[in-house]
Swiss-Prot record:
Main location per the UniProt record: nucleus
Modification sites for Phosphoserine: 80
Biological classification of the source: Eukaryota, Metazoa, Chordata, Craniata, Vertebrata
Name assigned to this protein: High mobility group nucleosome-binding domain-containing protein 4
GO cellular component: chromatin; nucleus
Family statement: Belongs to the HMGN family.
Residue positions, PTM ADP-ribosylserine: 29
Signal peptide interval: none
């Protein structure tokens, strides 16, 4: 089977050798390329000195508030005290 001639090897016969059109779909050429989304910033990693023990992740923040009704006293007494306190403050 004969090999295809390169474009530069044409010997003056412009009628026989035509420039092949670039084959690109009309659908693709009609709309521009979509813009790339901006990269999201990465989360800052925790500093080496601030690591907590593995078992204390959730419990460390709960103790800082000091007004956790489930820990200090039951919720019903806390709500009743709030209701009484609102009537006194005039």
């Amino acid at each position: 089977m004969p090999k295809r001639k390169a474009k530069g090897d044409a010997k003056g016969d412009k009628a026989k050798v035509k420039d092949e059109p670039q084959r690109r779909s009309a659908r693709l050429s009609a709309k521009p390329a979509p813009p790339k989304p901006e990269p999201r910033p990465k989360k800052a990693s925790a500093k080496k000195g601030e690591k907590l023990p593995k078992g204390r992740k959730g419990k460390a923040d709960a103790g800082k508030d000091g007004n956790n009704p489930a820990k200090n006293r039951d919720a019903s007494t806390l709500q009743s005290q709030k209701a009484e306190g609102t009537g006194d403050a005039k």
